[in-house]
């Protein structure tokens, strides 16, 4: 089978599992892969190719010319429209149109790619430091979903018993000792969303567009209307660099040279793509997280799993279902069942039915014990 080596390696290190939904994979795998790939491409263009070439005076020798280009590449340059006079360029214009990103674009993209992996890393850390083996339930559901009912029955009972034990047991001491799994899961989901929004803002600040977070849309419309960088100054190909030359007499001579930043041709396309990608990522992550949360919280989730045993003749069954979901399963149990449901609706339903039977038995035992206790109190008063 055809595979991309880097993507395969990234997948294995991130450990994409059954408990990761599509929005998680989109963020921690696909987005990270895109950013890191872009970082590799831009670094090759920046540090291997010719990122900047300057138009230098003829008096500059080869070494002087190379020194001047390296200096201008490391030092921030500024954009100034070529159709305007170059005499006495205001300092405020130089500061406002200063380019500070082209040297660091590959590093930024690499760091951003790593940042998208952080929520996944924390989710894996939480899995390894708690007593809730969520992956086990998903893997088991995936294994038995195509088995016959007889072969599946034993595993269903085992899963239900194991889930009941884990939900009701006290966690071993760890970083997440007093935090329920659903709370950890919710925090991780929020981190995915916060990370996407933060990167949307950071990319604007990095490119010097902090006053216009919608610079990507502006650039896109400019390209459609034939308005180029020569007018807007967005990702300019030609900039200017100021430096001083120390002469033998001890005097310093100010020089201004015109430089071509070839990497900006590439940066324009890369960062425009990522602007649209981050907009898509923010909205898709937001929608996915609200949808997943709503699916677990609303009563229909439990009703759908217990559909096979619904009896409309039982007056208080809805109340029993509600008590089963809120007090017996708790949010942790419903979260696990949602993961199991993502692998097999049938297995999730059968596990829920098995646990509901245990819930009714435990409820009956509790009622009997309560009646005995009340009778003892009543007889004692007599």
From Swiss-Prot:
Keywords: Cell junction, Cell membrane, Gap junction, Ion channel, Ion transport, Membrane, Transmembrane, Transmembrane helix, Transport. Pfam families: Innexin. The keyword Metal-binding does not apply. It comes from the Eukaryota. It is found in: Cell membrane; Cell junction, Gap junction. It is a multi-pass membrane protein. The chain crosses the membrane at residues 29-49, 103-123, 187-207, 270-290. GO terms for cellular component: gap junction; plasma membrane. One of its GO terms (biological process) is germ cell proliferation. Its main location: membrane. GO terms for molecular function: gap junction channel activity; gap junction hemi-channel activity. Belongs to the pannexin family. Structural component of the gap junctions. This is Innexin-8. It comes from Caenorhabditis elegans.
